[in-house]
From Swiss-Prot:
Region feature (Nonhelical region): 1-26, 837-863
Subcellular location: Cytoplasm, Myofibril
Coiled-coil ranges per UniProt: 27-836
Keywords: Coiled coil, Cytoplasm, Motor protein, Muscle protein, Myosin, Thick filament
Protein name: Paramyosin
Major localization class: cytoplasm
Source organism: Echinococcus granulosus
UniProt key word Heme: no
Length: 863
């Protein structure tokens, strides 16, 4: 230390001052900082352009979503119109079924009454035939009786002919009714065939759409798997970060132990070193808390995604079961499905974009985390550099103490130095006041240090340049170079072991921080007591100097000129000290500026985290909409199945109608055959009547033949009567069976009506689901607008950051100019005093030592 002082003193005496060289390196460093600030401004402008591009894309998406909402509203209006049409069709079908049932009942009642009347007539005819038989048996004995019997037979045959004519007319009317029913059945068959063809076509369209939806679902499932893999990668990155943090903690513990060893050797100034270490430890713990918070956020996000996946699977299974009940609505939902398909494509594109943005946000978070780790390493490096500079500060303060002793010895030689000592006392008081101001400034710097992490992203390149500046400062401080190189080598060797555990050292770190805080407080109290003791000692020395000055006043008249020279030298020293203090203030302001920049970097990091969280929320919203689309696809699949079942039921109804038609045709054929048979019988009866006329003319000749014919007629009438009764009974049974069939068809019609009512209710629920989907789209639109506002706000904040950076650069440049001006003034003053010999040259060398040490400390603080 003494050799360096001698070297500096000799240099001053020779007239070669290195202040210019020392000032050039801070100027170059500030120019580098200016370049870095320009680069940061370019990056901020680039970020602003990117944010404006994102704002334009979000505006376009907002327009697309508004168009999609209008299309959805149109689809809902069309669906309401279709529901009204279905309701009208249902009412018309119910009315038609009721009228058809009433007419069928009336027809069956009339047919039953007619058949019963015919049976009664046949029974009456049978009775008449028996009476005729008895009369003919009586007329065998008497020809006249036979003639009367023949006349009665003629009358009965005529009445029978009239009955057969009336029966023929009734059968014709029944045939006409059956033909009309057959025509109605044919029309219903054609209508059902057309509906069947339409249902088949719609079914094919739905099958094609279901295939498309299945492909979309597979794509979305692949995206979900990608997200799961990304979450696993994030977990692995988190584990790597924890190992890195543990290794950094171990490095910090080693450095702390080394620092304590140096603090024991350093003496009273160890408290300040502990203070700076406490500040760095607080910053490190804050970064660790932020890292743990981010880790917990990643774990919570992973857990939420897992729960969401299970919920989506359950919802998908539930919606598959629900979809089986909605397949019958495919005919009226074709237009809506096309609209939904277009919306699905838009949502798929949006989902892809959101997934890409989420991946970008995750990459950005990983990059920021890596930068935080690099910043932590560089902060540790700067901490070690700060420790070295504090050692220099201790040595400089020791030199200041030596200079104070020299000043006291010089004051003892002259009584006029008492006033100078009083001024020195006031200067020391000012120094104490400045110390309190510096402590307040330190507290302010600590508060500003909390805002330092927000500017990490923009200060990445600046911190790399700081590392280069640190190397330059090592070159400037040659007496510290070997020690710093050794520490750097040790740090490089220890960096390989700084990545294993973090939970083991967190508690030790907290205890160390608390101990360092207690140590800092105790050191501050000791420093305060030391300065108070120094002040008291200076007061005692002042009294002694006053006494010595009173005794030396008589002896030092010849030294008056020398005292004046020493007084001027002391004034120069005071001015140099003030210049050093101003330089210290400049360096403190620069430190505050750098602290504010780090706080801005931290705020930008928080903004990026918020953007990542927003992207994750958008991804969750997109996943919810994907699940809703999956449910709608399953619903449409179930609608398809239900419509296929309805088609099968309608096909069965069509087969039944065809069978009924065939049965009606068979009945019509049987009735036609019966009409022909009755016509033949009528002709036979006419022939019998003619034969009876001929028999009446030949009664006397052919009595036996008439008897035989009468017996044959009796047998024929009995046989035909039995046959007619049996035939009519069969007809009654057939009509009863037809009545049962019509009743069954009426019940089926009522069942189909209830089925249509259920379909109507299902359509209502579907329309409500569509309305709910529209509300969700509106909420998504509102969220998008909020995000646009947030992006605009971030853009404004980036502009404010760039403006603050330029203002800081202007302030730094102004401070550099002021420092250069003060350095020039000091060099001119030293040049003036250089020609003075004797003790004056020694005072100038002392002043030069103080200036050189203070400027070296200022250059180190700037770096």
């Amino acid at each position: 230390m003494s050799e360096s002082h001698v070297k500096i003193s000799r240099t001053i005496i020779r007239g070669t001052s290195p202040s210019t060289v020392r000032l050039e390196s801070p100027v170059r460093e500030l120019e580098d900082l200016l370049d870095l600030e320009r680069d940061a401004r370019v990056r901020s402008e680039r970020n602003a352009n990117e944010l404006s591009i994102q704002l334009d894309t979000m505006t376009e998406r907002l327009d697309e979503l508004s168009g999609t909402s209008s299309q959805t509203q149109d689809a809902i209006r069309r669906k309401d119109m279709e529901i009204a049409n279905v309701r009208k069709d249902l009412e018309n079908a119910n009315a038609a079924f009721e009228t058809a049932e009433a007419t069928l009942r009336r027809k069956h009642n009339t047919m039953i009454s007619e058949i019963s009347s015919e049976v009664e007539n046949l029974q009456k005819q049978k009775g008449r035939a028996e009476k005729d038989k008895s009369q003919l048996m009586l007329e065998i004995d008497n020809v006249l009786g036979q003639l009367d019997g023949a006349l009665k037979a003629k009358a009965s045959a005529e009445s029978k002919l009239e009955g057969l004519d009336s029966q023929l007319t009734r059968l014709k009317a029944l045939t006409d009714d059956l033909q009309r029913q057959m025509a109605d059945v044919n029309s219903a068959k054609s209508r059902l065939a057309a509906e069947n063809f339409e249902l088949v076509r719609v079914n094919q369209e739905y099958e094609a759409q279901v295939v498309n939806f299945s492909k979309t679902k597979s794509v979305l499932e692949g995206q979900l798997d990608d997200l799961k893999r990304a979450m696993d990668e994030d977990a692995r990155n988190r584990l790597n970060l924890q190992t890195q943090l543990s290794s950094l903690q171990m490095d910090y513990d080693n450095l702390q132990a080394r620092y304590e060893e140096e603090a024991e050797a350093a003496g009273n100034l160890r408290n300040q070193v502990a203070k700076f270490n406490a500040d760095m430890a607080a910053l490190k713990t804050r970064l660790e808390r932020e890292l743990m918070a981010k880790t917990e956020e990643f774990e919570e996000l992973k857990r939420k995604l897992t729960v969401r996946i299970t919920e989506l699977e359950d919802i998908a299974e539930h919606e598959r079961t629900r979809a089986n009940n909605l397949e019958k609505t495919k005919v009226k939902l074709t237009i809506e499905i096309k609209d939904l398909q277009a919306e699905n494509e838009a949502l798929a594109a949006e989902n892809g974009e959101l997934t890409h943005r989420a991946k970008q946000a995750e990459n950005l978070a990983n990059e920021l985390q890596r930068r935080v780790d690099e910043m932590t390493v560089e902060i540790n490096t700067l901490n070690s550099a700060n420790n070295a500079l504090e050692g220099d500060n201790m040595r400089l303060k020791g030199q200041v103490g030596d200079l104070t002793d020299r000043i006291a010895n010089l004051d003892r030689e002259n009584r006029q130095l008492g006033d100078q000592l009083k001024e020195t006392k006031s200067a020391l008081r000012d120094a104490n006041r400045r110390l309190t101001d510096l402590e307040a400034l330190r507290s302010q710097l600590e508060a500003d240090g909390d805002n330092l992490a927000s500017a990490l992203h923009d200060a990445e390149e600046a911190l790399k340049e700081l590392e280069v500046k640190y190397v330059a400062s090592q070159n400037a401080l040659n007496h510290l170079k070997s020690e710093m190189e050794q520490r750097l080598r040790e740090k490089d060797e220890e960096l390989e072991n700084l990545r294993k555990s973090t939970t083991r050292t967190i508690e030790e770190l907290t205890t160390t921080i608390s101990e360092m805080e207690v140590r800092f407080k105790s050191d501050m109290s000791r420093l305060k007591k030391k300065y108070e003791a120094t002040i008291s000692e200076l007061e005692v020395q002042l009294d002694v100097a006053n006494k010595a000055n009173a005794s030396l006043n008589r002896e030092n008249k010849a030294l008056a000129q020398r005292v004046q020279e020493l007084q001027t030298a002391l004034e120069d020293e005071r001015r140099a000290r003030e210049a050093a203090e101003s330089n210290l203030q400049v360096s403190e302001r620069k430190r505050i500026a750098l602290t504010s920049e780090v706080e801005e970097i931290r705020s930008q990091l928080e903004l990026s985290d918020r953007a990542r969280k927003n992207a994750e929320s958008e991804l969750n919203d997109a996943n919810g909409r994907i699940s809703e689309l999956t449910m709608s696809v399953n619903t449409l699949t179930n609608d398809k199945r239900r419509l296929e079942g309805d088609i099968g039921v309608m096909q069965g109804d069509l087969d039944e109608a065809v069978n009924a038609r065939k049965a009606a045709e068979d009945r019509a054929d049987r009735l036609n055959a019966e009409v022909l048979r009755l016509a033949d019988e009528l002709r036979q009866e006419q022939e019998n009547y003619k034969r009876a006329e001929t028999l009446r003319k030949q009664l006397e000749i052919e009595i036996r033949e008439i008897t035989v014919k009468l017996e044959e007629a009796e047998a024929f009438a009995t046989r035909e009567g039995r046959r007619m009764v049996q035939k009519l009974q069969n007809r009654v049974r057939e009509l009863e069976a037809e009545l049962d069939g019509e009743i069954r068809r009426a019940k089926e019609a009522f069942a189909s009506a209830r089925k249509y009512e259920r379909q109507f209710k299902e359509l209502q629920t579907q329309s409500e689901d569509d309305k709910r989907m529209i509300l969700e789209l509106q909420d998504l639109l509102d969220k998008t607008q909020i995000k646009m506002k947030a992006y605009k706000r971030q853009l404004e904040e980036q502009e404010e950051v760039s403006q603050l950076t330029m203002s800081k650069y202007r302030k730094a440049q102004q401070q550099i100019e002021e420092a250069e001006h003060r350095a020039d003034m000091a060099e001119r003053t030293i040049t003036i005093k250089r020609t003075i010999g004797g003790p004056g040259s020694r005072a100038v060398s002392v002043v030069r030592e103080i200036n050189s040490v203070s400027r070296g400390n200022r250059a180190t603080s700037i770096m």
